[in-house]
Amino acid sequence: MNTIIISAVNLTEGGTLSILKSFLQALSMSELSNIYRVIALVNNKDKILYPNIEYIELPKAKKRWLYRIYYEYFYFKKISNQFDVYLWLSLHDMSPNVKARRRAVYMHNPSPFFRWKVKDVFLSKKYVFFAMFYKWAYRINIHQNDYLIVQQEWLRKAFGEMFKVDQKKIIVARPYHEEIDSKERNSVSTLPFTFFFPALARPFKNFEVICEAVII
């Protein structure tokens, strides 16, 4: 039976976990789950159990980068050889070494474009080195993909230029949001308010921009 495999062994928290949940939920309820065998490679299946989805748990992937590299470039190849894989979708940036008729990768992390300064080395030395490393992690096998998936138009252009990828192969999957009624939008309260923005503490999230926008 033709198989769709979603690799997401590194997604355990924050927005990326929400994306994984939304994707698996939509896939489990779609007609595709009746046509294809769907297998999800995850860290822990307890929080993301949906019908019509099979799970393979790989908890070591999050513990050390060596495990992650082993899975992406060696172990996943063994898994792909066990099934007739129509689509292999990697939801966490790296393009694994696999056998599949169609391959796609969701590139959600903009770290390669982080313009770090000397002060950043003192504030978050680990992240600065991570940002420099991630550019090369993205590069491996990237041209083996049929499609790249990003969230924003500027990322489509930036990744296309950085890795010399035809931008027609890069899909912009914008986050879903409900339309705001124009009457509500124009009704601005003069009362004090509390602005609550839940997010993981990551330097590349540009919290300053969000705070400046609230002033407006």
Where do the protein language model's features map onto the residues?
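Active-site donor-binding segments of glycosyltransferases and PAPS-dependent sulfotransferases
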Residues: 5, 19-26, 32-94
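Conserved donor-binding/catalytic core segment of Leloir-type glycosyltransferases
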Residues: 5-6, 188-205, 211-214
